[in-house]
Amino acid sequence: MADGLNMGSLTLNDSQHAPAPGGPPSGGRAAYIPPHLRQRQVNANGDGASAPPPGPTGGSWGGPRGPRGGNWANANAPDFNPRGPNGNTNTNSGWTATEAGRPLFNPNAYGNPGHGGGYAGASARGSGDGQWRDGKHIPGPPNPRLERELFGVPNDPTKQNTGINFANYDDIPVEASGHDVPEPVNTFTNPPLDDHLISNIALARYQTPTPVQKYSIPIVMNGRDLMACAQTGSGKTGGFLFPILSQAYQNGPAAPPPSAAGQFGRQRKAYPTSLILAPTRELVSQIFDEARKFAYRSWVRPCVVYGGADIGSQLRQIERGCDLLVATPGRLVDLIERGRISLVNIKYLILDEADRMLDMGFEPQIRRIVEGEDMPNVNDRQTLMFSATFPRDIQMLARDFLKDYVFLSVGRVGSTSENITQKVEYVEDHDKRSVLLDILHTHGTTGLTLIFVETKRMADALSEFLINQRFPATAIHGDRTQRERERALEMFRSGRYPILVATAVAARGLDIPNVTHVINYDLPTDIDDYVHRIGRTGRAGNTGIATAFFNRGNRGVVRDLIDLLKEAHQEVPSFLESIAREGSGYGGRGGRGGRGRGANATRDMRRMGGGMGGPPSYGGGSGFGAPASNYGGGYGGAPSYGGAGYGGGYGGGGYGNPSGSTGPSSWW
C-alpha cells in the first residue's frame, strides 16, 4: 500500500527521486540515509562534495546561500569568519575593518537592516524607523497604523490636549537663577530644535511650549545642567525629552566603547546615551510612551525597564537596540549586575520626580548608579532634575549630581495650580462612604474621577463598595500585578471604568487625560503628597476639581493646607482655621522628616547664606525649627546631624515646637 501512496503527484518509488549516494541507480529502491550521515557517506565513497538540500536563507544548515556562508552541517564548509570571506565586515552591521583587523564603528550604517544595538548585527528595525547615514538623520517612512497608536486622532479622549486655560500659562512667573542663563524660546522652531522633532511635536498637536519647556529647551541645548521645579501638569516630560532628542537627531549616534568590539549577532550589553530614572512603574511606562512619540521615524530606539514585569521581554527589547533608556532604579541595578547594561556612554542623566525617589528610599541605588558604576563623572555628562517640589535637603543632595546648574522655578512651585478648584469638607471616618456617594451622584460620571486612599485594603474595599452601588469603578495599588495595574489604568483612561480608587502608587507623575475630579478620601500625612495627588487634574491648562475629606485625624497638615489654599486663592473653611488655632504643636513646617515646603522649599539654596562647599552638615545653629532666616551651621565638612538642630533631640525651638522637647506640645 505504501508503494501506491501518492503525495502531490510524488510516489515513494518515483524515479525522479535522487539516488542515495553510493546506492542503486535511479528506479531502484533506495535505502533511507539520515541527513546528517549523507555527506559522510559521499566523502567515504570518494564522490566529492555534492550540494546538500537547500536550506533557509541565511545558510544556517544547508549550504553557502546566506550572506555569511554559514554551514555548520557541512564538513567541507569554510571556517566561520566574522569579517567575511575577504576579511571585511558586512557594512550593514555598523562595523568596518581596519588594517589591524579590528572592526570600527561605522555611524553611517546606524539603522540599516541587520544593525542591532548600534554596534552588532541584528534584525531590521522595522518600516517606521530612520537611519543615520553620511552624517545626516534620514527619517523612516510614515507608518499610519503606528501614527494612530502613538498620537491618536483629533479629539481623541485618551490623548492629552491643551485646555481652555493654557493661554494663562504666559502669566505664570518664572525665576531662573545661575550665571549666563540662556534666553527662553517662545515657539517650537529650528533653531534650536531639529526639524524632525518639530514634525513629531506637530503630530502630537502641541502648539506652544509650556513655561518649563520655554526655559529648559535652550538651557539643555546650551549644555547646562538643570534643576527644574515646575507646577505639576506643566509639561516637565517634554521639558527634557525635546532637547535631548533634538540633539540626538542633529549629532547622531555615539561610537561604542572599545569593550563592545566582538559582540556579533544580537547585542548582549546595551550602551544607552540617555538615561531617565523615575520612581514608579507607571511613571516610567508613561515617559517611555512619550519618548516613542517624539522618536517616531527616527534612528533613536527608546527602551523601558521596571520591576514587577517579565525581565525576559525587557532583555529582548534591549538586545534589539537601546539608545534612550527609561528605568526604575531597582531594575536598572539588577540589569547592571547581570552585565546587560553599561552606562559608559551616557551623555544625559535625567532624574524625574527626584524628591519622591529619595523619599521612597532609592537614594542608595541612585548613588550607586550615578557614582558607583561606569557612568561618566559629573563633568562629562549633562544632568537634569525635574520635580514639582525640591525641599531644601533634597537640593543639597542634588548638588552632588549637578555642576554649574541653572535652577528653574516656574509658577507657584511646590504648590497647586489655580486651574484646580479645591474644596475641603469636614467628614468623620464613619461618614465618608455616604458623603462620597453624594458627591458622585451630584457630579455624575461624565469625566474621570480619581479617589485616593491610604491603604491597599481600603482601595479594594472601597472599589467593591462602589461597584455594589452600581458605580463602574476599579482599583490599583502595590499588591496588584503589573498586568492588573496596566489593565486598570487602561480601563480608566478609556472611560470604561470612569472611577479609579488608588493608593499613592498612582499619585506622582501619572499623566491621565481628562481627570476632572480628584477626591482625597484619606488625606496624606505630607502636604507634598497632597499637592501631587490633586495635580492629576487641572493638567496642561485644563480645569478640575479637588475635594478633600478632613477631620481632626488630619490636623498634622492643617497649617500647610491653609497656606496652600491661600496661595492658590481658594476658599479656606472656618473649621480649618479653628483647628489650626487649637494647638501650635501640629502643622509644623517640617512636613515629613524635615522635608516640608516651608518658605524656601522651592528657592535656589545657592542664593541663601551658608555656602555650598563640601558635604552637607545639618547640625549647629538654630536648626530647622528656627525662623527661615536662621539656617546657621553652614554646609561644610563631613555630614553631621547633631547639635541643636536636625536629629539632635529636637532641642530648644527645634522642629516647630516652641515648648522644647519636654513641653506640652512635644512630638514625643
UniProtKB/Swiss-Prot annotation:
Catalytic activity: ATP + H2O = ADP + phosphate + H(+)
Domain spans labelled Helicase ATP-binding: 217-408
Top EC group: hydrolase
Record GO cellular component, one term: cytoplasmic stress granule
GO molecular function, one term: G-quadruplex DNA binding
All copies of domain Helicase C-terminal, residue ranges: 419-580
GO BP terms: cellular response to farnesol; cytoplasmic translational initiation; negative regulation of cytoplasmic translational initiation in response to stress; positive regulation of formation of translation preinitiation complex; regulatory ncRNA-mediated gene silencing; spliceosomal complex disassembly
Residue ranges of coiled coil: none
Renumbered residue ranges of the record's region Disordered: 1-96, 112-144, 581-603
Q motif (motif): residue ranges: 186-214
UniProt motif DEAD box: location: 352-355
Domain notes for this protein: The Q motif is unique to and characteristic of the DEAD box family of RNA helicases and controls ATP binding and hydrolysis.
Name recorded for this polypeptide: ATP-dependent RNA helicase ded1
Source organism of this protein record: Emericella nidulans (strain FGSC A4 / ATCC 38163 / CBS 112.46 / NRRL 194 / M139)
Gene that produces this protein: ded1
